[in-house]
Design a protein with these regions (language model features):
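Acidic (Asp/Glu-rich) sequence patches and key acidic residues
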Residues: 1-149
Length: 149
């Protein structure tokens, strides 16, 4: 299994987004270093996902979009949950968004806050980050963030 961090296209763009792919152990090391630098914040348990049956959704199409009932309301509620920062005002990327591959939306503001913490770090760039992570976060902070799959 690999975690995929995928840049969200800006303004509904159709250009294939850039992505980063990590195996679980490597991602765990990256998250540990990001936590040490203050780039990641623990916001407590992740929010609960909306129950599709409550919205009258009866099925999903081949692309995974809900069908029936108030499908649009369900999608809107799901989008709010996937973007939710958590129970804190501390800037940074919420830990729960990086630990699971459920389609979390790491927002541009969360990415920008993480990059600001990185830029304030007085030491050398951590080797665990490699050469692509920080440029990816900068691009996500300037755009619409990224999704974790």
């Amino acid at each position: 299994m690999r975690y995929v961090w995928e840049l969200r296209p800006v303004d509904g763009g159709t250009t294939p987004p850039a992505d980063l792919r990590y195996r679980p152990r490597r991602l765990a090391r990256i998250i540990a270093v990001m936590t040490t630098l203050g780039m990641v914040v623990d916001t407590g348990p992740p929010p609960k996902f909306p129950m599709w049956a409550v919205y009258g959704v009866s099925d999903f199409d081949s692309a995974g979009r809900p069908l029936g009932g108030r499908a649009e309301d369900y999608e809107a509620a799901l989008a709010r949950i996937l973007s939710h920062h958590g129970r804190t005002d501390v800037p940074g990327i919420p830990l729960h968004k990086l630990r699971t591959s459920l389609g979390w939306h790491v927002t541009a503001a969360e990415c920008a806050a993480a990059v600001a913490k990185f830029d304030a770090w007085p030491g050398e760039p951590p080797a665990a980050f490699g050469s692509q992570l920080v440029p990816f976060l900068r691009a996500a902070g300037a755009g619409d963030g990224f999704e974790v799959h």
